Design a protein with these regions (language model features):
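Nucleic-acid-interacting cores, centered on viral/eukaryotic replication and modification enzymes
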Residues: 1-364
Length: 364
């Protein structure tokens, strides 16, 4: 309750130190960041330019935060010290390690903030602010998107130019993160490029950091590709995971659990995450609808998914059928982000539509 009562002071500090590359806020969620990431890469492909991006991820970002580094950053950026004092006092509470009934002496942690606490995301942003400001100022032409601890840095243009500038920016970013006592993951950090040659060159240049490049990759839980060929590997994996849950869903249905509600509130949202970027093809959409119908009806095999999913809706506002989201999301996001009141993509759209550049358009 103490944290919640004082949250407005922290929100005010966030507003005073807002940056265009920071996401995870009002109307700037992961879905918006993912859409814009894919839009930049796709526009470069439509304009027949080389494109590449690095996705830098941190190892245990919250657990590796140095309390001394956090204090130094708080003094630099005028963060409310009384709020930081309470946070650090909570993080540094004495604790014991227990294993097989044996307790250790009291241990006091000198690094780490609790993920999920009221101010944890803001404190991580506070620690990253100086490094990200430096990259944004040194490479203003490179789109930068930061969602909590996921950093996306892209470059477009001639192949050699892309290779040179993206390598330099990524190396500087990694160096600055390491200076802040944060560790860059060499297993989760990856890159995407528009050609095999660019993948090879960037992979060699950034091999020291363990960043490998491919024509498509996963970013913020969705598929991203640097070519005009759509990537749906994450989408296919989620469909396989849903099929693997058939026995569990059947047991829930036998226990009189409203499985249709589970599909409306959970399964469909998980399956269609990223559909606003790559859409859903006819065949996988039909497979999704059949799995949803099977989960909602006791014996849906051989029945029409249209009828089963229609009957599963308990009201006019319910949309158990995943076809609703699959059709509405791509069009809805394009209209919302690029419309006159959309906001975040408006400037980007006008820049892309300037003379000499290819006009961006959604995927067919």
């Amino acid at each position: 309750m103490w944290f919640q009562l004082r949250a407005p002071y922290i929100r005010r500090w966030e507003a005073e130190h807002e940056r265009p590359f920071f996401y995870a806020g009002a109307a700037k969620g992961a879905d918006v960041a993912l859409w814009l990431q894919a839009a930049h890469l796709e526009h470069a492909a439509l304009a027949q330019q080389a494109a590449a991006a690095t996705l830098v991820d941190l190892v245990k970002a919250f657990e590796r935060v140095s309390h001394i580094g956090l204090l130094t950053a708080a003094k630099k950026w005028d963060y409310p010290m009384w709020a930081l004092r309470l946070s650090l006092a909570a993080y540094r509470l004495g604790r014991r390690v227990s294993t097989q009934g044996v307790l250790s002496a009291i241990v006091v942690a000198c690094r780490g903030i609790t993920a999920g606490s009221a101010f944890a995301t803001t404190e991580l942003r506070l620690l990253l602010l100086a490094a990200l400001d430096h990259i944004h100022a040194a490479f203003p032409m490179l789109p930068l998107y930061v969602y909590v601890d996921d950093m996306f840095l892209a470059a477009t243009g001639a192949p050699k130019h892309v290779c040179r500038i993206l390598t330099s920016a990524t190396k500087q970013l990694v160096m600055l993160l390491q200076a802040a006592e944060l560790e860059v993951s060499d297993t989760k950090s990856e890159g995407v490029a528009s050609s095999p040659w660019l993948c090879l060159q960037l992979g060699k240049a950034l091999a020291i950091h363990g960043i490998t490049f491919s024509l498509s990759c996963k970013s913020l839980g969705g598929d991203v590709a640097a070519t005009l060929k759509r990537s749906v590997s994450v989408q296919k994996r989620r469909l396989r995971d849903l099929r693997a849950r058939r026995p569990r869903i059947a047991r829930l249905r036998k226990a009189a659990v409203g499985t249709a509600r589970l599909f409306r509130t959970g399964f469909t949202a998980a399956l269609t995450w990223g559909a606003h970027v790559v859409g859903v093809a006819t065949t996988p959409l039909m497979q999704w609808r059949r799995e949803a119908a099977r989960g909602c009806a006791a014996a849906a095999a051989g029945k029409s998914p249209d009828v089963v999913l229609l009957l599963a809706d308990e009201g006019p506002a319910h949309t158990t059928d995943p076809a609703f989201a699959a059709h509405a999301l791509p069009i809805g996001y394009w209209a919302r982000l690029c419309g006159t009141r959309g906001g975040h993509a408006r400037t980007w759209l006008l820049t892309c539509a300037a003379p000499g550049s290819a006009s961006p358009r959604p995927r067919a």
